[in-house]
């Protein structure tokens, strides 16, 4: 996993309010980060944070009530040896959860070794879940793509195409028909799971849509709160093409896909021409995609009916010759 620039300080700043973290020792270790080799070999955020585990000392160590009770039961020599081994390998930081008080000798050792030590009243399980989700998000593959990203009938749809084809105008018409804007011009996509890509708007462009001749429109102010969305999963790409595009297929026999962060996203191409109602065509494409996700493929059904009709015709012709 890629965790360049992620330090104890940045993790604390991003999560202190959510899980009520307090920094009690090791302030000099603010720049401490994950071991580079360990982070590279980690396959998921579950490898990066967990309950106290001396077998995996390089990860974030969370100590709840059971771990603190175990620690306090150890004799002085064993406690000193085990914590010495843990601190020596420089974990990013330690968290004392469940509202437990940090043992004085552990706090002193963290201070001397500049190992950040946090405390929180939140349960250890909740701390681990929160930090795993946080690390998954910041380390996930991401890309910024050009287009208009909309919520159409509950489906995340990215409208793409060359400059000047009317993507923003089409987006504005779809918004006026009751659909929602996620982002215009630049869309930040992040892959959060094996089949899950989430799209968001960069903070600078939040709620804004740029239309030639009108300038920047604040969609939230003009159309209301329900006209904008914070995020959506991308399920469909609509590619606008010029009428003279030689690669356009009127009736594509094979499904078309666009690779987004290694995940194939279903794509449809729509020709832009005078008199065509693009908003209706996009809505129809979305409805058709919903049917495809339910296992209903209209084109395949038509081809099957056509094939059956041709076979029946061939059989009747053969019988006619025999007569």
Curated annotation (Swiss-Prot):
Recorded coiled-coil stretches: none
Binding site for ATP: 161-168
Chain's gene name: hprK
Protein name: HPr kinase/phosphorylase
Subunit: Homohexamer.
Upper classification of the organism: Bacteria, Pseudomonadati, Pseudomonadota, Betaproteobacteria, Burkholderiales
Family that this chain belongs to: Belongs to the HPrK/P family.
Catalyzed reaction equations: [HPr protein]-L-serine + ATP = [HPr protein]-O-phospho-L-serine + ADP + H(+); [HPr protein]-O-phospho-L-serine + phosphate + H(+) = [HPr protein]-L-serine + diphosphate
Keyword Protease applies: no
């Amino acid at each position: 996993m890629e965790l360049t620039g992620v330090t104890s300080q940045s993790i604390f700043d991003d999560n202190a309010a959510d899980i009520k973290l307090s920094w009690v020792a090791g302030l000099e270790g603010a720049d401490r980060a994950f071991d580079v080799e360990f982070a590279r070999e980690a396959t998921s955020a579950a490898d990066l944070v967990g309950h106290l585990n001396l077998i995996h000392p390089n990860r974030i160590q969370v100590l709840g009530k059971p771990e603190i009770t175990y620690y306090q039961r150890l004799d002085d020599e064993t406690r000193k040896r085990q914590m010495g081994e843990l601190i020596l390998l420089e974990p990013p930081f330690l968290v004392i959860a469940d509202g437990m008080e940090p043992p004085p000798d552990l706090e002193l050792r963290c201070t001397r070794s500049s190992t950040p030590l946090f405390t929180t009243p939140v349960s250890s399980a909740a701390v681990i879940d929160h930090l795993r989700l946080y690390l998954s998000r910041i380390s996930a593959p991401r890309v910024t793509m050009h287009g208009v990203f909309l919520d159409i009938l509950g489906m995340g749809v990215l409208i793409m195409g060359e400059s000047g084809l009317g993507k923003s105008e089409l987006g504005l018409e779809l918004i006026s028909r009751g659909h929602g804007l996620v982002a215009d011009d630049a869309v930040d996509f992040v892959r959060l799971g094996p089949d899950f890509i989430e799209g968001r708007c960069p903070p600078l462009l939040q709620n804004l849509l740029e239309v030639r001749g009108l300038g920047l429109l604040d969609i939230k102010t003009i159309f209301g709160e329900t006209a904008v969305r914070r995020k959506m999963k991308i399920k469909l790409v609509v590619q606008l093409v010029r009428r003279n595009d030689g690669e356009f297929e009127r009736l594509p026999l094979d499904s078309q896909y666009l690779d987004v962060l290694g995940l194939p996203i279903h794509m449809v191409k729509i020709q832009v021409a005078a008199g065509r109602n693009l908003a209706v065509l996009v809505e129809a494409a979305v409805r058709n995609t919903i049917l495809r996700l339910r296992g209903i493929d209209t084109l395949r059904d038509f081809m099957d009916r056509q094939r059956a009709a041709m076979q029946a015709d061939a059989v009747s012709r053969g019988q006619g010759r025999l007569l």
